[in-house]
Amino acid sequence: MKRLCLSLLCALACLPARGEIGVTDVSGAGIRLAAPARRIVSLSPHITELLFAAGAGDRVVGTVDYSDYPPAAKLLPRVGGHSLDLEAIVALKPDLVLGWQSGNAVAAVARLRALGLTVHLSEPKRIEDVAGELERIGKLAGTEATANAAAKAFRERYAQLAARYSRRPSVAVFYQIWKQPLMTVNGKQIISDAIRLCGGRNVFAQLPILAPTVTVEAVIAANPEVIVASGMGESRPEWLDDWRRWTTLTAVARDNLYFVPPDLLQRHTPRILDGAEKLCIHLEAARGKRGK
């Protein structure tokens, strides 16, 4: 009986205290907050956007460069960009810091934790993971009603796109991030998940690096039916049309050179479904050109 009581006491000790908030992040680290976060620092543009989507935009006291959506995010104090200003972060006295596992330096995250800050890491690896991120943020910020509703709407829209496009005839796709160096994504990157959602196949899915450099010769050998470019802004990059010199490429011969605004596909946020839908429409157009 004593052994049973001791076991129960140990189990209860491992549970969050009454009112305490417990969440496990993508790294497996357990996050504990005594109360919903009121002062949050975001270390990535996509996290800033997720915070607003989860109803916690008014809790954000600092963020990084390129956090530009929604428009209110542009007004937030900056704490660095690729390199973080740790002093500025500490000065904001956050009760929660939300970081990007693959985008923030490991040493910087470790230093923030050593300084006594609570750091939760985000890394949606598949489109469906965005909904879970919204729910976790809602729990940490105490905005579950808004966050859960946003997650539900996201899952429903994702299911609709999957039902419409994922089983369509396959289309070989080359997704170009940049020109110099010539860069793409592998099969584990979330953009590849969008390609699969649309019934496409990433021709460089097998490469081991998330954002590998490739050669023009490798692209020609892969002979994609569609080339999709992102770039850095909201307008079609001039270098997308550089592919027209390679007239033997199926994508060129059929005029399947497309652009999707990078913020819609390269940020792990609810807007990724806007980008995915644009991509799906492009791939459907490419299917319509077969046999012509």
Regions found by a protein language model. Name each.
Residues 86-93, 115, 214-223:
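Short helices/loops that flank or line small-molecule/ion binding pockets
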Residues 38-92, 96-102, 203, 231:
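A short, structured surface patch at a secondary-structure boundary
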